[in-house]
Amino acid sequence: MVDGRKPHINVGTIGHVDHGKTTLTAALTTVLAKRLSGEGNKSVKYDEIDKAPEEKARGITISTAHVEYETENRHYAHVDCPGHADYIKNMITGAAQMDAAILVVSATDGAMPQTREHILLAKQVGVKDIVVWMNKCDVVDDEEMLSLVEMEIRELLTKYGYPGDDIDVVKGSAVKALEEESADGVWSEKIMELMNPLEKIDLPIREKDNPFVRSIEDVMFNTPGEAQ
């Protein structure tokens, strides 16, 4: 149950297709459910996030998915955005709801076309804060390569108007965090490390005195292979 007394933050995962956004979303809910079970957290499995038949069949996120989790200090509503270029409109819908974004970048690939586009679109829709999760670090043994990927990401963030030199970059593996039985494992600790900068994000000013406004969204699967 959500504790309405806690400050609320809207966050979400953005980035290139197959870099691990949905896996990270599942890992966040799972690790927090283990570490802070008394905070109303519930583990959400990967296939519960990408639950539409076409998403399961193709192994990609098409529509935005929503989960919730909490720390001792804050409540988070999390939007998992699609990374495929064909569903960029759905990504924009999700990003427009965010106070802060978690940019997911694979350590094996570095910045890819949708990495760049998602940073640009996040800036254009008014996402003020970005935290970087460098994923799949378990399969990269070369520290120099990890440093090069981090440098590339920081330069890209700076190019699109974010303070690239100051943004937190957390290196981890969402898959390994999900596989760990103990919530105190090394990869689960990386998930908690990711939460630290999110806990420090300035709380947005909510316009409580203005008329109520909310977004309405849906994805219609009426053509094979195409979402509208």
Curated annotation (Swiss-Prot):
Q: Which GO terms describe its molecular function?
A: GTP binding; GTPase activity; translation elongation factor activity
Q: Which InterPro entries match?
A: EF-Tu_GTP-bd (IPR041709), EF-Tu_GTPase (IPR050055), G_TR_CS (IPR031157), P-loop_NTPase (IPR027417), Small_GTP-bd (IPR005225), T_Tr_GTP-bd_dom (IPR000795)
Signal peptide start and end residues: none
**Region G3, annotated ranges:** 80-83
G2 as annotated region, ranges: 59-63
Q: From the UniProt entry, list the residue stretches annotated as the region G4.
A: 135-138
Q: Where is the tr-type G domain?
A: 6-212
What family, per the record?
Answer: Belongs to the TRAFAC class translation factor GTPase superfamily. Classic translation factor GTPase family. EF-Tu/EF-1A subfamily.
Q: What is this protein called?
A: Putative elongation factor Tu-like protein
Which species is the source of this protein?
Ehrlichia ruminantium (strain Welgevonden)
